[in-house]
Amino acid sequence: MTGNLVIAALGVRVGLVCDGLDADARTAVDEAWTDAATTGAADIEVVADTGGSIRSLLSSLSQRVTLAAIEAQRGRLWMLHAAGIALPDGRVVALVGPSGRGKTTASRVLGEAYGYVSDETVAVDSSGRVHPYRKPLSIIEPGESEKAQRSPSVLGLGRLPDGELQLAGIVVLDRREGVSGAVVSDVDLGDALEELVAQSSYLTNLPAPLRTIAAHVASVGGVRRVSYTDAAALVSVLPELAVESPSRPRVSKPVSLGGSAVVGSSPDRVFRRVAPLDELPLADPDRLALFHVDAAHAGTVRVLAGIAPALWRAADGVGLEALVDAAISAYGAPGDKDATVAVEAAVDELVAADVLKVSSPAKASDPALWRIHDDVAWTGESSRV
């Protein structure tokens, strides 16, 4: 790695291998990544492309470094597609949103007043510590078709405070026209969960993804939404988006549903839960978030509401009648509606969504048989069974 740059990205030391670049291209790489430079041996390496324009080189390098760092930390950190801004005492606010939501613009404006953590990814470990990624920002410049990659210091963005950074706020960006100033509102976790999942990298590799998210959300006092038109309006409200003393995240234990025997008449169909990677109970009102992973390792979060949570919890090889009883026991009779019709409709939706599976009831087991093992000598004329 002699003569190449080592940078800090999401808690990983990434070596930028620039051996094939000319002097101008190498200087451009050094200048773009100067604020992320660190010491020590690289954990992983990314080889800079040769050929093409310097702007194309820097853009490609930024994307590849990001992907390599995220890949290196998969399953270890909660990595949010978010901008990160640090207050002087090290508390960090994560501004969450997809591409085009305004994260880079918000980073530039807020970074002039506070510390720039990242405009791309906020990586948080199990203790709530944030690992910075002071990558160059992609900037549109007049008369240029390709975006420029400018270092935070060149753009006048703030340095990070000494010491460790700690997650203190999770904020969903809501940039839209016609908003005067910045309007801050609380967001229920159940309502924010789908977006937080969508903006998380390699969530399926975390052992308890939903409960991990919930633990971090609880440690910062909940999720907030900030609606605004001009990013300048965010400067004055940023401190109130950070909790004063974030607590250490505590991941809750998994819910144990146990088993239930099938009693009463033998049903034509029985229903069972499709096992999720993780589940998260949500209160007020009673809801249940489920995170399923398909054969392609893609994750899907679903928040069950209404009578669906009770149906899912009760679906342990039982028939429709037992599910009706479970719904009535949990939420009461539905008044003038037919409980069986309502439950059957809800169950059909859960089956269609691959949350429940349906099968025929198990048949009585065949009479027990004995068999002589294949490696035992057998001299009789009858079969081994």
Segments (PLM) and residue ranges:
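Post-Walker A alpha-helix
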Residues: A106-S107
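Extreme N-terminal, non-catalytic leader segments
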Residues: T2, G15, A28-D89
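Long, charge-rich, low-complexity alpha-helical segments
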Residues: T300-V385
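Short alpha-helical segments that sit at the start of domains
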Residues: P276-R313
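Glycine-rich, often acidic-flanked micro-motifs
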Residues: L10-T27, A42, E71, H81-A83, ...
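Active-site beta-strand termini and strand-to-loop segments that position acidic
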Residues: I7-A9, L87-P88, H292-A295
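Actinobacteria-biased recognition of intrinsically disordered, low-complexity terminal regions
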Residues: M1-L5, P249-V270, K357-V385
